[in-house]
Amino acid sequence: MKIQSLSYLLVETTDLQEWDDYAKDVVGLMKNDSLSDDQNLYLRMDKKSFRFHITTGDSQKYLAAGFSLSNKAAFDDAKSELDRANIEYEELGDEIAKLRCVEECIGLNDPAGNRLELSYGSEDSSEPFISTQDIKGFITEGLGFGHVVFAAPDLELAHRFYIDILGFGDSDYMNFPMGPAPDAPEVKLNFMHCDNPRHHTVALYESPIPPSGLIHTMVEVNDIDEVGYGLDRAMQNNIHISSSLGRHSNDMMVSFYMQTPAGFDLEFGYDGWQVDWDNFEMQKSKIPSFWGHAFSPPEN
């Protein structure tokens, strides 16, 4: 199976306006007015019709991540591989495919219960992308919109699923103590790439599934100033800063983390490593960042 990229994120909310304000005033995303209504908010960050679909419901949480395949043949091959591996999936049908702005899509769960969708033929918008915060553009072309980090209580089981079933490749295994104490518990993460140069498209963090359903997602901008402006906007709008500015040790991303209305974090970064996979050896990292990234949980 050759998954090309992370194509979209689905989120449930009890307050659509809160997400609208967050996307417009902080992140700099563009609302797709032709798709959005009083129950659904479609958000753009490039030429695609949407990258985030926020829908009203009873809770604030992650619903699913969509991953794209190159064409119908690749999509059908992916379903055949799932069948051979006895992995259950759901044909989502024409109505859902229309909502996702794709030709066809299926839904499935990873071993931890994280909801995934596979699709092909994602639709481009007929309107140019114009950031509400004059961002020069997000780094998406050929890379997908960013990455996601899932919780996985059984890290090895989930890791094998992404490698053996979905066809991801290993980028990095990271483990480090959670704090300076000699008996501090160890943090363990697997970072994996799909069929594009982004250092990782999916990471797995060994932990129970959080109430928000997701650890974090990431978007990438073109320069360090855009990161700084984003940090300013977050603070000006009283958004909780989950992590200070820093540079990661594995993908070299300079970024900060802020809380979304759903409770999971959004990493807002620049300068992520685009890898030549033909000349790459899997990494084993002992520190999450070279500098910065002091994490601060919300008070409530």
Give the ranges of each region predicted by the language model.
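A compositional/structural signature marking long, glycine- and acidic/polar-rich segments
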Residues: A184, L189-N190, C194-D195, H199-S249
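Conserved donor-binding loop and adjoining core beta-sheet/short helix segment
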Residues: S34-S70, G93-E95
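Short, charged/polar, Gly/Pro-enriched secondary-structure boundary elements
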Residues: K48-H53, G113-L116, R198-V202, F264-D265
